[in-house]
Swiss-Prot record:
Topological domains annotated Cytoplasmic: 1-8
Organism: Xanthomonas euvesicatoria pv. vesicatoria (strain 85-10)
Keywords per UniProt: Cell inner membrane, Cell membrane, Cytochrome c-type biogenesis, Heme, Iron, Membrane, Metal-binding, Signal-anchor, Transmembrane, Transmembrane helix
Biological processes, Gene Ontology terms: cytochrome complex assembly
Family to which the UniProt record says this protein belongs: Belongs to the CcmE/CycJ family.
Cell division as UniProt keyword: no
Keyword Lyase: no
Cellular component terms (Gene Ontology): plasma membrane
Protein name: Cytochrome c-type biogenesis protein CcmE 2
Amino acid sequence: MNPQRRRRLWLVLALVLAGGLATTLVAMALQRNVAYLYTPSEVLRGDAGAHSRFRLGGMVEKGSFKRASGALEAQFRVTDGDAQLPVSYDRILPDLFREGQAVVATGRMQNGIFVAEDVLAKHDETYMPKEVADKMGSAHRKHDVPTAAGQAGELH
């Protein structure tokens, strides 16, 4: 093999190796930042994984919100109509956060409690995030829950 071919072979091998390394690093970064959406029923079934980071979607159960006077930490339950999951959050809640409203929280399970890192609340009476609406639609139909449109199980 002449020197020019050998140099070209090393260059091609180096480029393939660098491309593989870059692909691996991108895949690892994306995997760490992906947070799948689960309902309380799916979490309690074990679909979310014991220590993985995920998003919890559902409705804030009426009468479940608790916060000590002067404290930032809040506790509440998120429900999908079939199951409830306790949530703990130690930051400032969004202005639109209310009981009976849709919420999506990102965090992890710790000792049977979902410890949220971030909480998003819906922005008006009729809006519900599409992912939450899709996952909760069957629970709403099952329990004949009326929606803003006035029909049971129909989420918009």
